[in-house]
Amino acid sequence: ARDGYIAKPHNCVYECFGAFSSYCNGVCTKNGAKSGYCQILGTYGNGCWCIALPDNVPIRIPGKCHR
C-alpha cells in the first residue's frame, strides 16, 4: 500500500471542493485505503489524496490527464 492521489481511468484525479468534505474519504475507503481527504491546491489541483491505498489501485502519475 502507498499514499497518493487516487486516479480515475486516463490518469485523472478525483476532483474535490472542500478540505473537510467526506467525499474523498468515501472514494478512498471504497477502494481499500485506510482513509482519504481533499488536498486543496495540490500538485494536480484539488484532488483526493488517499492514505494506505492498495497497490493494485491506480494513482495519478506525472503526465497528462486524458479526459
Swiss-Prot record:
Gene3D superfamilies: Knottin, scorpion toxin-like. It holds the Pfam family Toxin_3. One of its GO terms (biological process) is defense response. Keywords: Disulfide bond, Ion channel impairing toxin, Neurotoxin, Secreted, Toxin, Voltage-gated sodium channel impairing toxin. Residues 67 form a propeptide. Its main location: secreted. InterPro entries: LCN-type_CS_alpha_beta_dom (IPR044062), Scorpion_toxin-like (IPR003614), Scorpion_toxin-like_sf (IPR036574), Scorpion_toxinL (IPR018218), Scorpion_toxinL/defensin (IPR002061). It is found in: Secreted. SMART domains: Knot1 (SM00505). The keyword Disulfide bond applies. GO terms for cellular component: extracellular region. One of its GO terms (molecular function) is sodium channel inhibitor activity. The keyword Endoplasmic reticulum does not apply. Disulfide bonds join 12-65, 16-38, 24-48, 28-50. Expressed by the venom gland. Residues 2-66 form the LCN-type CS-alpha/beta domain. Belongs to the long (4 C-C) scorpion toxin superfamily. Sodium channel inhibitor family. Alpha subfamily. Alpha toxins bind voltage-independently at site-3 of sodium channels (Nav) and inhibit the inactivation of the activated channels, thereby blocking neuronal transmission. Has the structural arrangement of an alpha-helix connected to antiparallel beta-sheets by disulfide bonds (CS-alpha/beta). This is Sodium channel neurotoxin MeuNaTxalpha-8. It comes from Mesobuthus eupeus. The lineage of its organism: Eukaryota, Metazoa, Ecdysozoa, Arthropoda, Chelicerata.
